[in-house]
Amino acid sequence: MDIVALLEDLVKGLLDAEDKFFENPKDFSSLERSIKSSTESFSAAFLGVVLSRMNSILSECGARKERFNIQRVDKRILITSVGDVVFDCTYFKRKSREGSHSYLLEELIGLAYHERFSEEAEVMLLTEALKTSYREATKVLPSKQRISKTTLRNSMARSLRIIRASFPN
């Protein structure tokens, strides 16, 4: 989906929310929820388009063609602060003797292998978990993906290991 189509969907969602509000002006909370939902959907889709375009740029890059072969293109879902971002992510194989594999896009944007959360989403989850509970923290993101308490606990433990490694005794 291109950016213009995303903007058209956003404007349609906003205008629909406005129309419903004018039919029932006492229901301001519905307007607020509709606007939030429309803008989050737009933001997540926009991020997906941007990441897919960056992936295409990496795939077509001359320097990449000299050192890597394309193995396959996978659909990736990244849980972010604005919702689930779906994008194409190409799996590459090095042409050198070692022949290691990697997702260049993930390396470029600093995602660890098999990471499910963006940095901002992880901060939101961990902050909420510290304030309330693991269960409540799993509800803070507008994601359709299941986020278990165990996933959150593991993420928190990983973050604590990183912090401890950064500040040795």
Predicted regions and their residues:
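Short, conserved DNA-binding cores of transcription-related domains
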Residues: 1-95
